[in-house]
Amino acid sequence: MSRVAKNPVKLPSGVEVKLVGQLLSVKGPKGTLELIIHSSVEVEIVEEAGELRFAARNGDQQTRAMAGTTRALVNNMVQGVSQGFERKLQLVGVGYKAQAKGTVLNLALGFSHPVDYELPNGITAETPSQTDILIRGIDKQLVGQVAAEIRDFRRPEPYKGKGVRYADEVVRRKEAKKK
């Protein structure tokens, strides 16, 4: 059995889990997420203990790995509908600005035109200051994907460090060429 799948997923109060066929839906105070469970993974809902248990239907390596992956995905779903996920981005550079307007994030990144990024459903963006962006949502994968797409508009360059970076990212700097 996968070492990850051995640990059950604890369900916090206010989180409901339903399994209909292969479709697992997790409902919490922040919203609802669904996942199609792979046919080689068995999911057991233990109501008394308030937890989910995962097991591989047979013992081969790929099935055990799939059980661990499914457990990790469901754990992220439970955490997402109860607490949510957030990613912080920083804009470093002269004239780099961000402004959130509803479902559109307006970015000035040193191009000749402003960049308008349409946020997908379930994702919200805040701009506490002009150079900080907070991306929030219940789907961990989608929050990370949106943050990566925004960062890709202007990645941090190694000479001056200008660009869009994650708040916890360390940009490796290079020395300028000498004559």
Swiss-Prot record:
PROSITE patterns on file: RIBOSOMAL_L6_1
Pfam families, per database record: Ribosomal_L6
Alphabetized SUPFAM superfamilies for the sequence: Ribosomal protein L6 (SSF56053)
Alphabetic keyword roster: Ribonucleoprotein, Ribosomal protein, RNA-binding, rRNA-binding
UniProt record, GO biological process: cytoplasmic translation
Keyword Ribosomal protein found: yes
Gene Ontology terms: cellular component: cytosolic large ribosomal subunit
Gene Ontology molecular function: rRNA binding; structural constituent of ribosome
KW Protein transport (keyword) present: no
Family per record: Belongs to the universal ribosomal protein uL6 family.
Function as written in the Swiss-Prot or TrEMBL entry: This protein binds to the 23S rRNA, and is important in its secondary structure. It is located near the subunit interface in the base of the L7/L12 stalk, and near the tRNA binding site of the peptidyltransferase center.
The protein's assembly and partners: Part of the 50S ribosomal subunit.
Name this polypeptide is given: Large ribosomal subunit protein uL6
Annotated source species: Pseudomonas savastanoi pv. phaseolicola (strain 1448A / Race 6)
